Swiss-Prot record:
Top-level taxon in the UniProt lineage: Bacteria
Pfam family, one: Ribosomal_L28
Family stated for the protein in its record: Belongs to the bacterial ribosomal protein bL28 family.
Keyword vocabulary terms for this entry: Ribonucleoprotein, Ribosomal protein
Biological classification of the source: Bacteria, Thermotogati, Thermotogota, Thermotogae, Kosmotogales
InterPro entries: Bacterial_rp_bL28, Ribosomal_bL28, Ribosomal_bL28/bL31-like_sf, Ribosomal_bL28_bact-type, Ribosomal_bL28_sf
GO biological process entries: translation
Protein name according to UniProt: Large ribosomal subunit protein bL28
Amino acid sequence: MSKVCEICGKRPTTGNTVSHSNKKNKRWWKPNVQKVKVIVDGEVKKMRVCTKCLKAGKVQRAV
């Protein structure tokens, strides 16, 4: 499943996990993307939307 928000374009990003001894290991931070039914131009469509966009009300959910 693609981890990209179709509204804001948020996608996974990389970085390092840093241990107490300062060793660095690569890791991924993934956005919390949900598959939701959304009303777009009067039609119901399934989209992948991050929870930040859902909370902000950037999409109108279909009931």
